[in-house]
Amino acid sequence: WIFLQLFKHGLAYKASMPVNWCTSCKCVLANEEVVEGVCERCGSAVIRREKSQWMLAITKYADRLIDDLDNVDYISRVKIQQRNWIGRSVGAQVFFDIAGSERKLEIFTTRPDTIYGVTFMVIAPEHEWVEELTTAENREAVEAYIAETKRRSERERIADTKRVSGVKTGSYAINPFSGREIPIYISDYVLAGYGTGAIMAVPAHDSRDYAFARHFGLDIVPVVEGGNIEVESYDAKEGKMIKSDFLSG
């Protein structure tokens, strides 16, 4: 009954999504069932593949779910777990033109104030535009990287913050505020199911973007005063805006 109500209100829908697939059991595995790229039950290789499945559009009613936790008689610990699981992100959608194309790459960011510090973009290996954005000279490297990524679960990708990997698509985006042309990369630290599956990278003010920029020799432009970007990113939101045109000061 509950599922039917969700379906009637457009909150239950079918979509093709990347899943963990055991090559031996021939079934979908939860992230917790994948250990170092293999199935915890049979030890066979686990790959990432697309599969059509029913989804619940939790983000469409996340605010109500979170707010109404105040009206239920749950213990505090459970309410905290629910709030963390549902999540609430406040930010902005930004569209970046693709150089030489009519397309615009959409991202969601909780730090639109750092837009002038964007020096590259990253899309998830499963992003629907991977093939379109990959140039001929980069195709072989991209295909090899995608194949490698399919052997890792999302849980491993999220947890492994020290490992830095990625590959150039060969395409470029245009920063809508600075007008700067910036490269588009593919990396497994971006997840297709989170936000739009693409990010604007601000290495001066995000630790994972910082590690990526250092690894690939990309520009790091601070736009919030504070910290020492020669050593690490300055992730704090407090500070004077710099190098940001009308936002500076």
Regions found by a protein language model. Give the residues of each.
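Long, charge-rich boundary regions
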Residues: 47-102, 106-108
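Short secondary-structure capping/junction motifs at helix and strand boundaries
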Residues: 8-19, 74-76
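Residue-level signal for inorganic ion chemistry
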Residues: 6, 10, 65, 213
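N-terminal Rossmann-like or analogous alpha/beta NTP/dinucleotide-binding catalytic cores
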Residues: 1-8, 84
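Hydrophobic/aromatic-lined pockets within catalytic cores
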Residues: 7-11, 70, 217
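Non-cofactor substrate-recognition interfaces
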Residues: 2-4, 14, 18-57, 98-249
